[in-house]
């Protein structure tokens, strides 16, 4: 079975594209450029900084234009590990995502679902013309796996959202909710 046959197909299509781009920690330039190209293709305002953080802005859908914006956040980098004997150079070669329809895994390497699947979900939401949503500020940070370096360098001067949905978790089926009061 091909990964593009999984549902939601838009998400897994983006995830397969992400797997084709080397994006280990410290090597996020190509995935950041991919996200910028995505924004341009969809007519969305976007920016990339010197740390390879990418921010993409999408106006609210019809009826939601004046709602408070929300940040959708994920990180662009992945932990690059491989099985003994695997000759893939993860700094320049693609990850081969495999599926049996129930599980997704990589052939000989880590998959990069942390946090590539979050980036794929965010891109699918940004690309959709059918999902009702408030204004979205998509924040895609770099080098989370090696100390949240991108988040530390993120320019937040044009981010106006008071709510953030971080799509990254250690446990399947667990939702974490937290609140930080900013004055």
Task: Give the ranges of each region predicted by the language model.
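Short acidic loop-to-helix transition motifs that present clustered carboxylates
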Residues: 51-55, 145-147, 172
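A glycine-rich helix N-cap at a beta->alpha junction
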Residues: 155-176
